[in-house]
């Protein structure tokens, strides 16, 4: 009996050593033939980065507002730096009319730290470009910069850079113009190289984080703006006419609690970076458009009750959040140097916050409207669900906030937010309820940045783009 017990114990102890060994796929072997094929009918790719994924430069001074890190970087705690980083404010003006001299100037690729609660996806963006390179896509930005010599071969991958501070619907309209421009380029190159006149060009779009919201608005509404009266635009799927595949990597479709926390508190990206005050961040409409939905109960008062509307300006003013925080008056003074009266400056700041909140409410309602996309548009979600991610916060009578609950996600975006899951906890026995009709969903056990490093991400993305069946 002892001998049998010893043998059994030995077998049990040896089981882990006999377990399966997982290997990463040989992507070159899998996709090299497809990648090397010159196919005039292969869809070109547009890559859209998310928050902070584009370099920002002041057109007047040449100063790099975002994208120069270390010595010489713009400090948002100085008068000049604060006004460069923040967007202008002005009472009686629409958000779209509040312009400064800063513009996007290309995409970034390799900076990694946390900002606004979102790990900067710049490294993730590089990994996306590297993956597409394996698939044989020739990137215009890399080619024109001389980073890669493609010879005389035409470009099949385009980086869409944009000012990520602005209203996301505005960025979607810029995307509409960008796609029209690249359509003409692809048509001209295809006729020149293959003698084929393309009547239309369909693109595949790959997005990361907030870039997914830019693309989602575009495929739904094309270049249409949000109406000034607060109503929703007509859902035409105008942009979907130019898109076959839309890949969204870690998109905050249902918002992120981190966006709320950093609008309230400001943020210090990393040890070597300056603090970005709440008033500076509060000038950026896009950040409000990343707020979580009230119906998902991300916020509770000191009695455990959810406020009816997270976009209610009175809620923010009564709790002294963001631009409404009296402690931000010094920053507001730096942002409005021509306004002598403290009362007038506060009036302008509160007006800006109100406009940004109402615009965000309108924008998210436009995205959340349930609708079936055209059959030709296929949607792929790649998200993380193995990291604890902020889910619920509670505020006391003085407006102070404490995170109370976490949930599965990628450390930045909840699984439920990426899916745009409308189920409440008591309904999780039912199948997914979402206004987004996903064609394919892939969960990766990585954080917000690590998703694009995972071999499963690379393999599945290339299959989806290169091999998956398409509508004729």
Task: State what each model feature region is.
Residues 6-16:
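Bacterial N-terminal signal peptides
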Residues 6-7, 234, 370, 449:
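Generic detector of short alpha-helix boundary/capping microenvironments
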């Amino acid at each position: 009996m002892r001998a049998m017990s010893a043998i059994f114990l030995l077998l049990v102890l040896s089981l882990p050593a006999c377990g399966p060994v997982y290997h990463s796929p040989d992507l070159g072997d899998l996709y090299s033939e497809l990648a090397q094929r010159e196919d005039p009918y292969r869809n070109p790719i547009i890559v859209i980065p998310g928050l902070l994924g584009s370099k920002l430069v002041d057109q007047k001074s040449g100063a790099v507002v975002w994208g120069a890190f270390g010595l010489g970087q713009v400090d948002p705690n100085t008068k000049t730096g604060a006004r460069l980083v923040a967007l202008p404010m002005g009472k009686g003006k629409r958000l779209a009319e509040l312009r400064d001299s800063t513009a996007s100037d290309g995409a970034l690729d390799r900076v990694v730290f946390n900002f606004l609660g979102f790990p900067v996806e710049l490294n993730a963006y590089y990994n996306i470009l590297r993956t597409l390179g394996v698939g044989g896509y020739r990137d215009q930005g890399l080619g024109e910069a001389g980073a890669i010599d493609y010879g005389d071969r035409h470009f099949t991958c385009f980086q869409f850079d944009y000012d990520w501070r602005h209203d996301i619907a505005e960025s979607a309209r810029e995307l509409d113009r960008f796609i029209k421009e690249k359509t003409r380029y692809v048509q001209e190159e295809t006729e020149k190289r293959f003698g084929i006149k393309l009547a239309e060009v369909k693109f595949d779009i790959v997005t990361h984080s907030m870039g997914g919201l830019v693309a989602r608005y575009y495929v739904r509404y094309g270049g249409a703006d949000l109406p000034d009266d607060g109503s929703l635009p007509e859902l035409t799927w105008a942009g979907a006419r130019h898109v076959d595949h839309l890949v969204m990597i870690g998109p905050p479709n249902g918002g992120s609690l981190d966006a709320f926390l950093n609008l309230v508190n400001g943020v210090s990206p990393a040890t070597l970076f300056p603090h970005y005050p709440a008033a500076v961040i509060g000038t950026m409409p896009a950040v409000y458009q990343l707020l979580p939905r009230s119906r998902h109960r991300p916020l509770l008062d000191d009695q455990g009750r959810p406020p009816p509307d997270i976009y209610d300006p009175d809620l923010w003013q009564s709790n002294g959040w963001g631009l409404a925080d009296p402690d931000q008056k010094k920053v507001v003074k730096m942002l409005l140097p021509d306004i002598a009266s403290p009362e007038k400056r506060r009036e302008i700041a509160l007006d800006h916050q109100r406009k940004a909140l109402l615009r965000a409410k309108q924008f998210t309602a436009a995205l959340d409207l349930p609708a079936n996309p055209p059959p030709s548009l296929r949607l792929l979600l790649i998200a993380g669900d193995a990291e604890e991610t902020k889910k619920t916060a509670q505020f006391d009578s003085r407006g102070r906030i404490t995170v109370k609950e976490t949930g599965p996600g990628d450390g930045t975006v909840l699984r439920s937010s990426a899916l745009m899951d409308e189920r409440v906890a008591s309904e999780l026995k039912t199948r997914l309820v979402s206004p987004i009709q996903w064609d394919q969903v892939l969960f990766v056990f990585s954080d917000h940045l690590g998703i694009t490093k995972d071999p499963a991400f690379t393999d599945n993305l290339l299959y989806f783009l290169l091999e998956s069946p398409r509508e004729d």
